[in-house]
Amino acid sequence: MSFEEKVESLHPAIFEQLSSEFEQQIEVIDCENITIDTSHITAALSIQAFVTTMIIVATQLVIADEDLADAVASEILILDSSQIKKRTIIKIINSRNIKITLSADEIITFVQILLQVLNSILSELDVL
């Protein structure tokens, strides 16, 4: 499988997993003119999935043994599985002209950690 094919198959799967772990429940009752913006969260999760994919692929490029590469990537990404699962519940009752923007601060902070890990891996590979 080529580098591009690995990225194309891994990224959507990781994004789907991250999205499913991020719970959002918004109820709107008897309201009008409501805007709900979750694009920050979607973009942040997509970036997190991409960086995670790059860490996995970089590990597989360095370690020829696929099973060992997967084990090392899993060990590196132990933080990824221990990420705080976010649950957002918003209820709006009898209100008007409401705008809700859900932020992605926690996700972005975690992405910064993953980027530092990726930077370290690429530095060790003399790519940077």
From Swiss-Prot:
Keywords: Sporulation. One of its GO terms (biological process) is sporulation resulting in formation of a cellular spore. One of its GO terms (cellular component) is spore wall. InterPro entries: Spore_coat_X/V. It comes from the Bacteria. This is Spore coat protein V. It comes from Bacillus subtilis (strain 168). The lineage of its organism: Bacteria, Bacillati, Bacillota, Bacilli, Bacillales. The gene is cotV.
